[in-house]
Curated annotation (Swiss-Prot):
<dbReference type="GO" id="GO:0009097">
    <property type="term" value="P:isoleucine biosynthetic process"/>
</dbReference>
<feature type="domain" description="KARI C-terminal knotted 1">
    <location>
        <begin position="209"/>
        <end position="344"/>
    </location>
</feature>
<feature type="binding site">
    <location>
        <position position="68"/>
    </location>
    <ligand>
        <name>NADP(+)</name>
    </ligand>
</feature>
<feature type="binding site">
    <location>
        <position position="217"/>
    </location>
    <ligand>
        <name>Mg(2+) 2</name>
    </ligand>
</feature>
<keyword id="KW-0479">Metal-binding</keyword>
<dbReference type="InterPro" id="IPR000506">
    <property type="entry name" value="KARI_C"/>
</dbReference>
<dbReference type="Pfam" id="PF07991">
    <property type="entry name" value="KARI_N"/>
</dbReference>
<feature type="binding site">
    <location>
        <begin position="45"/>
        <end position="48"/>
    </location>
    <ligand>
        <name>NADP(+)</name>
    </ligand>
</feature>
<dbReference type="InterPro" id="IPR013116">
    <property type="entry name" value="KARI_N"/>
</dbReference>
<feature type="binding site">
    <location>
        <begin position="108"/>
        <end position="110"/>
    </location>
    <ligand>
        <name>NADP(+)</name>
    </ligand>
</feature>
<feature type="binding site">
    <location>
        <position position="158"/>
    </location>
    <ligand>
        <name>NADP(+)</name>
    </ligand>
</feature>
<dbReference type="InterPro" id="IPR036291">
    <property type="entry name" value="NAD(P)-bd_dom_sf"/>
</dbReference>
<comment type="function">
    <text>Involved in the biosynthesis of branched-chain amino acids (BCAA). Catalyzes an alkyl-migration followed by a ketol-acid reduction of (S)-2-acetolactate (S2AL) to yield (R)-2,3-dihydroxy-isovalerate. In the isomerase reaction, S2AL is rearranged via a Mg-dependent methyl migration to produce 3-hydroxy-3-methyl-2-ketobutyrate (HMKB). In the reductase reaction, this 2-ketoacid undergoes a metal-dependent reduction by NADPH to yield (R)-2,3-dihydroxy-isovalerate.</text>
</comment>
<dbReference type="InterPro" id="IPR013328">
    <property type="entry name" value="6PGD_dom2"/>
</dbReference>
<dbReference type="GO" id="GO:0009099">
    <property type="term" value="P:L-valine biosynthetic process"/>
</dbReference>
<feature type="binding site">
    <location>
        <position position="217"/>
    </location>
    <ligand>
        <name>Mg(2+) 1</name>
    </ligand>
</feature>
<dbReference type="InterPro" id="IPR013023">
    <property type="entry name" value="KARI"/>
</dbReference>
Length: 491
């Protein structure tokens, strides 16, 4: 099979990369009714599989789970989760032939095997759903022409999808129809009903494409969402300890610092995050972020180039066939780092202390968010998509680090995201070491003293922060998410 994106001509590539439309709430007036009375079979019962299924059932849909025979016979975790929540569970052969919509929510590396198994069992005119388009775009999976192929991609981990639904809300969601597989023209109706059944329509839905979702998703998770947080954690911890900070305190400042900082980001964008600093600290954070952007821009661009060309995907799929040798090696090495093995700090760190003593971390967040956004937009991805795949998801990933450090982040994210994270962080850490060596007192671990500030300089910096394109689009999109709960647990 050929990478689907690479089979398109340039005009088609640009059209699909640039497909992004914020959908009005009136477009979801019918809710999930298009799928009511139809059989929805979910393949896979992980975080997305279980939680989307719970939401869809609560929205009145007929949901069951198709699992492999051995998973049922051995009563594996997927079988236990589905049965304990009262769902009907059966083998592929028992459930797929009756399904009107088959939703594939297994890990990326399993998609080809799953799709090749279920396709012959699917009835004529059925639909196949994904929550990530990697199998279609990067693997180039060929789907039977009578089958409608759609995507509903919540921009949150599965647990958040469920929690927000239970609160009567939802999470921002991308939906798409594969242009090669919409024989009856019903793909958008199916995708809208599925999104409504998960609650996504209450938080904002973008009509996108499989291509735009995959390319932007890969870029975000490799760079700012996971790679930058991992590289920043390792660099900042080592710097603090090198300068005499208690390793336990240093570990807590970083582990909970990302979450505390990005909670401000979630509520009011980069502007609010920077406003949490004193004026001297804000000016210093801005200067550091500009330096970081200049240093890291080529690395961000390389990741985007490799994602667009398919180089990243081919390398990762080669590792799949080699029993994940690179992935497992990188995972083991990360677990042995000084940050991951540092003792826990039993004392309390006040919320403002995370800002005052984390100026460099704030600069890293600002630089990483803006670089990821700018690089995606420069590659033809629309600003709304770039926002969701950079700034919006960052607090959610930071929250995983607050739970169990980098280990938890890498467990929660997909293997695809984890592989890309390691590629980025392994390149970024040595790239930034000379920069780290030139830091000044107050950049990390100590507060910058109050002092005189040049009014004109402060005015210009404030204007530069507020006028960035991500702040403009973010203000609009956050207007649809004002009811989302705070997630920070730092203390």
């Amino acid at each position: 099979m050929a990478n689907y994106f690479n089979t398109l001509n340039l005009r088609q590539q640009l059209a699909q990369l640039g497909k992004c439309r914020f959908m009005g709430r009136d477009e979801f007036a019918d809710g999930a009714s298009y799928l009511q009375g139809k059989k929805v079979v979910i393949v896979g019962c992980g975080a997305q599989g279980l939680n989307q299924g719970l939401n869809m059932r609560d929205s009145g849909l007929d949901i069951s789970y198709a699992l492999r025979k051995e998973a049922i016979a051995e009563k594996r975790a997927s079988w236990r989760k589905a049965t304990e929540n009262g769902f009907k569970v059966g083998t592929y052969e028992e459930l797929i032939p009756q399904a009107d919509l088959v939703v594939n929510l297994t890990p990326d590396k399993q998609h080809s095997d799953v799709v090749r198994t279920v396709q012959p069992l699917m009835k004529d005119g059925a639909a196949l759903g994904y929550s990530h388009g990697f199998n279609i775009v990067e693997v180039g999976e060929q789907i039977r022409k009578d089958i409608t192929v759609v995507m509903v991609a919540p921009k949150c981990p599965g647990t958040e999808v469920r929690e927000e639904y239970k609160r009567g809300f939802g999470v921002p969601t991308l939906i798409a129809v594969h242009p090669e597989n919409d024989p009856k023209g019903e793909g958008m109706a199916i995708a809208k009903a599925w999104a409504a059944a998960t609650g996504g329509h209450r938080a904002g839905v973008l009509e996108s494409s499989f291509v735009a979702e995959v390319k932007s998703d890969l870029m975000g998770e490799q760079t700012i969402l996971c790679g930058m947080l991992q590289a920043g954690s390792l660099l900042c911890f080592d710097k603090l300890v090198e300068e005499g900070t208690d390793p336990a305190y240093a570990e807590k400042l970083i582990q909970f610092g990302w979450e505390t900082i990005t909670e401000a980001l979630k509520q009011g964008g980069i502007t609010l995050m920077m406003d949490r600093l004193s004026n001297p600290a804000k000016l210093r954070a801005y200067a550091l972020s500009e330096q970081l952007k200049e240093i890291m821009a080529p690395l961000f661009q390389k990741h985007m180039d490799d994602i667009i060309s398919g180089e990243f995907s081919s390398g990762m799929m080669a590792d799949w066939t080699n029993d994940d040798k690179k992935l497992l090696t990188w995972r083991e090495e990360t677990g042995k780092t000084a940050f991951e093995t540092a003792p826990q700090y039993e004392g309390k760190i006040g919320e403002q202390e995370y800002f005052d003593k984390g100026v460099l971390m704030i600069a890293m967040v600002k630089a990483g968010v803006e670089l990821a956004f700018e690089t995606m937009v420069d590659s033809g991805i629309i600003e709304e998509s770039a926002y969701y795949e950079s700034l919006h998801e960052l607090p959610l990933i930071a929250n995983t680090i607050a739970r169990k450090r980098l280990y938890e982040m890498n467990v929660v994210i997909s293997d695809t995201a984890e592989y890309g994270n390691y590629l980025f962080s392994y390149a970024c850490v040595p790239l930034l070491k000379p920069f780290m060596a030139e830091l000044q007192p107050g950049d990390l671990g100590k507060a910058i003293p109050e002092g005189a500030v040049d009014n004109a300089q402060l005015r210009d910096v404030n204007e530069a922060i507020r006028s960035h394109a991500i702040e403009q689009v973010g203000k609009k999109l956050r207007g649809y998410m004002t009811d989302m709960k705070r997630i920070a647990v730092a203390g």
